[in-house]
A protein has these predicted regions:
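SAM cofactor-binding core of SAM-dependent methyltransferases
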Residues: 6, 18-81, 88, 92
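S-adenosyl-L-methionine
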Residues: 1-18
Length: 92
């Protein structure tokens, strides 16, 4: 079943307070939120995504932006990869 995000634009506009900041999409899925975040941050900004689903992770590998990295892991393990103080915004 295809997930259609509700209030996508509004939620991302609220999330991004610094176009040069670092952001995390904790549930990549098919990348709807990630794609919009990447469109709204600058080339100096950075987006990381997490998804433990192998199909979602494989789909994320199609994102070729230099300011994007995906992790095949659960967001509950964020602290293995990041200090939360260094993140400007997180979306679940």
């Amino acid at each position: 079943m295809l997930h259609i995000p509700v209030l996508l634009e509004e939620s991302i506009d609220f999330l991004i307070q610094d176009k040069n900041g670092s952001y995390i999409d904790c549930t990549f899925g098919r990348g709807g939120h990630s794609k919009l975040i990447l469109n709204k941050i600058s080339s100096k900004g950075f987006l990381s995504s997490f998804d433990k689903d192998p199909d979602a992770f494989k789909f994320s590998q199609g994102f070729k932006e230099k300011n994007f990295k995906s992790f095949h892991d659960s967001f509950k393990n964020l602290d293995k990869y990041f200090k939360t103080e260094s993140i400007n915004g997180i979306i679940y």
